Amino acid sequence: KPVFEGRFNLGVVSLHLPMILAKARRESKDFYEVLNYYLEMIRNLHKRTYEYIGELRASVNPIAFCEGGLLGGHLKPDDKIKSLLPPMTLSYGITALNELQRLYNGKSIREDGEFALEVMKYINNYTNKIKEEDHLLYAIYGTPAESLCGLQIKQFRKIYGIVENVSDREYVSNSFHCQVS
């Protein structure tokens, strides 16, 4: 019998990793303490989203939920859709991994990606742990977020100003990409 997992993303919330490192430094806190705060915040948002969506009736999207557009999507219009949600993901988005590494030690992830890799392993271990605890399919998502990447620069600059190779362009890099120049 085929197994279908991660065939539908219920939502992604993207971490602004350079902002988290800058905040930790400004507040003289451990980076992972601040990162945990945001990981838990996103976890709680995802759990609320899952519960909210699970209470929706199949009639909100009859092609997907009543006419078989999604695996198991043969519910009656008044049925709640919670039974269809288990194979769907709740994602932690990653942007600006290269800028995180640059802020950490001035090097790109091509020159020295150790800290960036350490952070990704940490987030992966965290999501694996909470998958078991919450029985939800959490995922890590390399955010392809062109408009978000521009917004994140504005947010960073507003608080921390222009930092060379971190916030001196009009956008941060998508997910784990490097700037080309």
Question: Where are the language model's segments positioned?
Answer:
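Contiguous, well-ordered alpha-helical segments that form the cores/surfaces of helical PPI scaffolds
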Residues: L90-L103, K121
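Conserved catalytic cores of very large enzyme subunits
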Residues: K1-P86, K107-S181
